[in-house]
Design a protein with these regions (language model features):
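H-loop/switch region of ABC-family ATPase nucleotide-binding domains
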Residues: 77-78
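A short, surface-exposed alpha-helical micro-motif characterized by mixed small hydrophobic
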Residues: 83-85
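Conserved ABC ATPase signature
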Residues: 16-20, 24
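Conserved beta-strand-loop-alpha-helix hinge in the C-terminal portion
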Residues: 96-118
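Catalytic Walker B motif of ABC-type/P-loop ATPase nucleotide-binding domains
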Residues: 41-44
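Conserved catalytic motifs of ABC-family nucleotide-binding domains
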Residues: 37
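Conserved ABC ATPase "signature" region
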Residues: 1-12
Length: 126
């Protein structure tokens, strides 16, 4: 119950999992991962398949965990906007670590540009 309260979903207690929206389900799963409260939380594409409103609420919870519980959070994400907004440190990986540092430094690096854009044509790689 305390973990559901931490993620702002105390009202979901007792609800059937099948009746929850994608965002609600993600917050319930996050609450499950928070009991007992860990020092490190690992997340892999945590809002995949969740609508924009659910994603926003989920990341508000993540921000709260980081600020109020001083929790270390390692997250895999391909959403560069989320990475820019939430990450203290970014690690760019493509078979190996290509670059790490602050989001702005990584996003402006040649390694980043080479990973996402064809240097000849200036087009995004598929």
């Amino acid at each position: 119950e305390e973990a559901l309260e931490i993620v702002g979903s105390k009202d979901l207690k007792g609800r059937n999992l099948g009746s929850l929206s994608g965002g609600e389900l993600q917050r319930v799963m996050l609450a499950n991962a928070l009991y007992p409260l860990p020092e490190l939380l690992l997340l892999d594409e945590p809002v995949s398949g969740v609508d924009a409103a659910g994603s926003e609420k989920f990341y508000e919870v993540i921000r709260d965990l980081k600020q109020n519980y001083h929790m270390a959070i390692a997250m895999v994400s391909h959403d560069l906007g989320i990475v820019r907004d939430f990450a203290d440190k970014v690690v760019l990986i493509n078979k190996s670590v290509l670059k790490s540092g602050k989001a702005e430094d990584v996003f402006n690096s040649q390694e980043f540009k080479s990973s996402f854009y064809s240097l000849d044509e200036g087009e995004e790689k598929q």
